[in-house]
Each structure stands twice: as structure tokens, then as C-alpha cells.
Amino acid sequence: MKELFLIIGAPGSGKTTDASLIAQADATNITHYSTGDLLRAEVASGSELGKTIDSFISKGNLVPLDVVINTIVYALKAAPTKTIIIDGYPRSVEQMMEFDKVLSEQNEICLKGVIEVRVSEEVAKERVLGRNRGADDNEEVFYNRMKVYTEPLNEILDFYQKKKLHFIIDGERTIEPIVADMKELIKKIQSI
């Protein structure tokens, strides 16, 4: 059975970097995906699902939730490793509920933990505005992305806390101890 870990955190929390470094350090055992990468890879594959996704993306439309979840589940089942990390998902209560429903209807993937990389808004803002990655790293866009992240957060955390799947990592440190703690946490959860 595949073991899934979801990594969530504010923009600038380092969740993508953390997940990527963990998977790179243990590539024979851990695969890291981001939802956007999965959708782009499916389009590039030329599959029927990829053509469906492309029909939305090429028009600038959002990909429907059921298509996104089918893409994620398909990738999880086909992953080359037993342990899979997805960062930045779920982003809404609707995504969370639908993903939970789909996972509960199958027996190949087990959600083992939802790891929150917790940082203050000040630290997140400082990191995002300091990284200078492009046009989307300005103050107005940061506050919009922060709002999109925080609005559903309490409901998402409550849901996973009730299932005893929510774990917190202090993201306000340098990358090395964060990654080390996350690796250790994943190993600990897997041994339960």
C-alpha cells in the first residue's frame, strides 16, 4: 500500500523546498509531487486525461476538481515508491472533502499524515518578497495568496486533527533542521 503525506503551509513557508529535498535525499523510497507538476505531466503524456486537462488549461480555465483528483490518484498509484509526498494540497475544504472521499473508496493509498510547515505571516512575507522569483512575488499578490491559504485553514486543520493526521513542523528555522525534523516525523509516523 502507498503511504501518502500531504505538506501544507503558507506561501513562503518552504513546503515545496522541504518536500523536494526529502525526496531527493531518499529517491529510492520517496517520491515528491506538486499538483501543478502532475497536471502538466499528464498533459505532456498525451493521454485522454491529459487532453481533458489541456482543454481547460489552454483556455485559461480552472481544471475541474474531479479531474484534478483523478490525476493525483492515478499518479499516486503509479508512483515508483511506497512513500509519496504532495505539497500544497489540499487548498480548499472542497478539495479536502472530495480527496478524502476518493481515498476512502479505494485500498491502494493510505493518507498517513498532513504536515503543516508553520510560519508567521511576517516570516512568510519576508521570504516571498525576498526571493524575487517573478511577477507573482509582490506584496499585493502575497496578501491575496495568504488569504487563499488562511481562509479554509482552520476547517482543514480541524478535519485532519479529528482524524489524528495533523502534525506541525516549525518552519521559522533554517532549512537543514526543518528537513531533518520532517524526515524524522515521516519515519516516526510510518512506524505507527
Swiss-Prot record:
Q: Name one GO molecular function term.
A: ATP binding
Alphabetic keyword roster: ATP-binding, Cytoplasm, Kinase, Nucleotide biosynthesis, Nucleotide-binding, Transferase
Which reactions fall under this protein's catalytic activity? AMP + ATP = 2 ADP
State how it assembles: Monomer.
InterPro entries assigned to the protein according to its UniProt record, in alphabetical order = Adenylat/UMP-CMP_kin (IPR000850), Adenylat_kinase_CS (IPR033690), P-loop_NTPase (IPR027417)
Gene3D superfamilies, alphabetized: P-loop containing nucleotide triphosphate hydrolases
Give the metabolic or biological pathway. Answer: Purine metabolism; AMP biosynthesis via salvage pathway; AMP from ADP: step 1/1
Where does the signal sequence lie? Answer: none
Tell me the organism.
Campylobacter jejuni subsp. jejuni serotype O:2 (strain ATCC 700819 / NCTC 11168)
State any GO CC term. cytoplasm
What is its subcellular localisation? Cytoplasm
Name of protein:
Adenylate kinase
Q: List the residue ranges of the region (NMP).
A: 34-63
- Binding positions for ATP per the UniProt entry: G12, S13, G14, K15, T16, T17, R131, R173
Q: Which NCBIfam families match?
A: PRK00279.2-2
Pfam families for this protein: ADK (PF00406)
What is this enzyme's EC? Answer: 2.7.4.3
Question: RNA-binding as a keyword?
Answer: no
Task: Give me any GO biological process, just one.
Answer: AMP salvage
Which comment does the entry carry about domains? Consists of three domains, a large central CORE domain and two small peripheral domains, NMPbind and LID, which undergo movements during catalysis. The LID domain closes over the site of phosphoryl transfer upon ATP binding. Assembling and dissambling the active center during each catalytic cycle provides an effective means to prevent ATP hydrolysis.
Q: Which domain of life is it from?
A: Bacteria
